[in-house]
Amino acid sequence: MSLPPEILLHGYSIGIFPMAEHRNDPDVFWVDPIRRGVFPLNGFHLSRSLARRMRRGGYQVSIDRDFAGVLDGCADRAETWINPEIRASYLALHHLGHAHSLEVWQAGQLIGGVYGVVLGAAFFGESMFSRRTDASKIALAHLVDRLRQTGFALFDTQFLTAHLASLGAVEIPRAEYRRQLERALNGAADFAAVIEQSPQGVIQRITQTS
């Protein structure tokens, strides 16, 4: 059974998020980490190799063009916490305008992406995937730039992985996370705003702020 949108949003508003043990487990549980992963929006680490890859182009980035495709891409791995109940819950949130995706395309194929939940000026990153080298890094670079440009104050990554840490994410105590969350919830942001996001523009803005 999927979680009703109002229950999901309330959970995020108090600093917890749902997970499942694996795709075939119908049970969903709430998680409240002692230490929380966050992505400082002015601290993205853009490596020279990633900047070169972005300058070469050959890819396109879109917003909310294929939310279900991103969700399924994130679930398409040997071990995943995205079970049918969670999938249905986030699709419902997306239809209500509270969950968004950023897609990376190449030659008409979805090669990477990230999705998350929005409340106020907080973006709760849920999962990402990559079907080509650097596709998830490109997605994150464009996502961080979009969050900065559209008024966000908090990018919650839930947990800190080595991959995220290499790109600039950090870990903070639960109490500090909740302080940042409260401030962000009182703010306003527009994830889907029309903005400039050319690869060169993203590189320039990230380089100026990191």
From Swiss-Prot:
Keywords: Acyltransferase, Cytoplasm, Transferase. Its EC number is 2.3.2.6. Signal peptide: none annotated. It is an enzyme of class 2 (transferase). It catalyses: N-terminal L-lysyl-[protein] + L-leucyl-tRNA(Leu) = N-terminal L-leucyl-L-lysyl-[protein] + tRNA(Leu) + H(+); N-terminal L-arginyl-[protein] + L-leucyl-tRNA(Leu) = N-terminal L-leucyl-L-arginyl-[protein] + tRNA(Leu) + H(+); L-phenylalanyl-tRNA(Phe) + an N-terminal L-alpha-aminoacyl-[protein] = an N-terminal L-phenylalanyl-L-alpha-aminoacyl-[protein] + tRNA(Phe). It is found in: Cytoplasm. Pfam families: Leu_Phe_trans (PF03588). The keyword Transferase applies. GO terms for biological process: protein catabolic process. It comes from the Bacteria. GO terms for cellular component: cytoplasm. GO terms for molecular function: leucyl-tRNA--protein transferase activity. HAMAP family: Leu_Phe_trans. Functions in the N-end rule pathway of protein degradation where it conjugates Leu, Phe and, less efficiently, Met from aminoacyl-tRNAs to the N-termini of proteins containing an N-terminal arginine or lysine. Belongs to the L/F-transferase family. This is Leucyl/phenylalanyl-tRNA--protein transferase.
